[in-house]
């Protein structure tokens, strides 16, 4: 009886240890392919900062929510990032950066129609030059490619060129 009790105790201890270790496991990051979609939008715009850039003024609460959304996105929690951006958009619904960030989150989630819609809304209320404009049209182009609307994607890539405006020469 002691041997049986000892065997059950060892088995129970092993199972308890296994359960505790498995509770420490983290969720796997989002697939690399999905993450690279938004980077295809952001990276080229960041590299082309020579031209004229336009940035709207922001509410401090919106700035905080936007930064938290970026941190959640970088941690791989796209649902939390989208939730935080939705809250920020309730405060400032016509903020082109927020709308574009939401478009990029939708790209990462594979929600091509929504990504295109958010990018178009961002362009409608945002600047017609600079990084935001470039990110808008890259998002639209990528979303249309994923939706197999290749002619429309090519049109979006042409519009992208209009976003690059050189600042005036200062003497």
Show the residue positions of the predicted features.
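Bacterial Sec signal peptide processing site at the extreme N-terminus
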Residues: 18-45, 171
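Alpha-helical segment of the N-proximal tetratricopeptide repeat
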Residues: 55-83
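TPR alpha-solenoid repeat register
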Residues: 98, 132, 136, 169-170
